[in-house]
Amino acid sequence: IKSGIEQNWSSDYKVMIEPGRAVVNNAGLILYTAGAIKEDRGDKPYILVDGGMSDNPRPALYGSEHKLFNISGNKKDEEKVFAVSGRHCESGDLLVEEANLPIDTNPGDILMSTSTGAYTFAMASNYNRVPKGKVIGISSTEVFDLVKRQSFEDTFAQDS
């Protein structure tokens, strides 16, 4: 690439590679805790989770889709369709419009959202003063902190 640029343009160019979705997207996931489940919301029940558009704004901004799995274990094989909504009381805070989850999904269950390794943390915010969650790394031999969980006080730390 570099020699091709130098042959066709000036040598003032600097070649950089941005890993992006193709390389790192599937390296990340987000864990949510299911809160209330609203059965009276039309054609499907809504699960409210302890995160939302502040930790993953991509669905609200441009409709990105993420698969969701209930990883709490000992669940029935039979599934039903749920909508999964965030905690921000915004009409756009819909993380997954149609998630096929076990019919016995309950408050307190852990839901795993996949393909969140690219841009998700970089786009996260403290919207509604919600602290950002912890980011961990997992290797073949250890689990380690990459970014520590914010406290509520951390969301005010830069205010004057």
Task: For every predicted segment, state its role.
Residues I1-W9:
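Alpha-helix-loop-beta-strand connector modules within alpha/beta enzyme cores
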Residues S11-S160:
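Charged (often Lys/Glu-rich) extended helix/loop segments that serve as interaction or gating elements
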